[in-house]
């Protein structure tokens, strides 16, 4: 069996749960194109249990992976703007690797008074943790192809062999698991076959998509013994909590946590019980 997911520190000042509890219901926006961002939200909620959360998923344009960069930037800025016009936000978390790698500069230019946190593949800590010098990045095909990903590898993992594996099927499997469907380990073995067949496979695997931590248990059962699985969820949570707790002005809300979708359809209806399990008792449609 592989080793459980490692909690790596790739962000600055850490916030504790006791610190977070002193904050009076700040509103934190967590955005993703799908439901993978719930894995990030889950980590943040552990640090800020008393915060008010708004989860937004763009089911109208999901998945972002194959969309043009210009489309993603314009789309994300529009969606975040629509939420910010209606709610006073203490922090914005872009819980999507694809959106983070292209839209953060535009968002930070527009929302200069709201801290914004993005998600990037944890290449740097993986390069430090590996014992055999072989790192695997498991991500969407788009993240695997993006120049930003290769820049991270060139900056932080030049002394390692980094094997990239892009899969849209894993995203679909994670979504199905959230709906209560059993994940086939045989299917995972087929997807991971390029690594499993190697004489020296990665001993450290980076989960480069926020959907993939939802499959952690199944991935651990399929990967070789001793494999470390890491992602940036814990670091993102610590960074978000620190930014919220250390604000001069607390942006508070008395609302219950809820979710926004961009399109009301059968898919969004099926997600309602899933979202409720995560603490989002209400699902609304966001008008752009």
Swiss-Prot record:
Cite the entry's keywords alphabetically.
Answer: Cell shape, Cell wall biogenesis/degradation, Isomerase, Peptidoglycan synthesis
Name of the coding gene: murI
Provide the GO biological process annotations: cell wall organization; peptidoglycan biosynthetic process; regulation of cell shape
Which residues does UniProt mark as catalytic? 96 (proton donor/acceptor), 209 (proton donor/acceptor)
Instruction: Quote the InterPro entries the UniProt record gives.
Output: Asp/Glu/hydantoin_racemase, Asp/Glu_race, Asp/Glu_racemase_AS_1, Asp/Glu_racemase_AS_2, Glu_race
Tell me where on the tree of life, at the top rank, the source sits.
Bacteria
Question: Is Cell wall biogenesis/degradation found in the keyword set?
Answer: yes
Write down the species: Proteus mirabilis (strain HI4320)
Q: Which SUPFAM superfamilies does UniProt cross-reference here?
A: Aspartate/glutamate racemase
- Entry's Gene Ontology molecular function annotations: glutamate racemase activity
Q: State the protein's name.
A: Glutamate racemase
Q: Could you tell me which residues belong to the region Disordered?
A: 1-21
Q: Membrane-spanning residues where?
A: none
Q: Which reaction does it catalyse?
A: L-glutamate = D-glutamate
Name the family: Belongs to the aspartate/glutamate racemases family.
Query: At which positions is substrate bound?
Result: 32-33, 64-65, 97-98, 210-211
Q: What does this protein do?
A: Provides the (R)-glutamate required for cell wall biosynthesis.
Asked if the Swiss-Prot or TrEMBL record annotates the protein with the keyword Isomerase, the reply is yes
Q: Which residues form the signal peptide?
A: none
């Amino acid at each position: 069996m592989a080793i459980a997911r490692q909690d790596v520190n790739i962000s600055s000042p850490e916030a504790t749960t006791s610190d977070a509890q002193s904050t009076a219901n700040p509103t934190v926006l967590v955005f993703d194109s799908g439901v993978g961002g719930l894995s990030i939200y889950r980590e943040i909620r552990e640090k800020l249990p008393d915060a008010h959360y708004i989860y937004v998923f763009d089911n109208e344009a999901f998945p972002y992976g194959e969309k043009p960069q210009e489309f993603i930037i314009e789309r994300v800025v529009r969606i975040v703007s629509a939420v910010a016009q209606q709610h006073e936000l203490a922090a914005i978390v872009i819980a999507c690797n694809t959106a983070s790698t292209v839209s953060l500069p535009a968002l930070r230019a527009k929302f200069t008074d709201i801290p914004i946190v993005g998600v990037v593949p944890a290449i740097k800590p993986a390069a430090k943790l590996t014992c055999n010098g072989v790192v695997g990045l498991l991500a969407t095909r788009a993240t695997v192809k993006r120049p930003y990903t290769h820049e991270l590898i060139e900056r932080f993992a030049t002394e390692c062999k980094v094997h990239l594996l892009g899969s849209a099927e894993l995203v679909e499997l994670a979504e199905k698991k959230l709906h209560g469907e059993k994940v086939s380990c045989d299917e995972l073995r087929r997807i991971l076959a390029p690594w499993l067949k190697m004489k020296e496979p990665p001993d450290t695997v980076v989960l480069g998509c926020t959907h993939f931590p939802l499959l952690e248990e199944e991935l651990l059962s399929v990967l070789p013994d001793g494999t470390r699985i890491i992602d940036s969820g814990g670091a993102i949570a610590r960074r978000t909590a620190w930014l919220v707790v250390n604000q001069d002005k607390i942006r508070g809300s008395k609302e219950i946590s809820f979710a926004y979708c961009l399109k009301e359809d059968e898919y969004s209806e099926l997600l309602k019980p899933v979202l409720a399990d995560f603490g989002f008792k209400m699902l609304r449609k966001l008008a752009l």
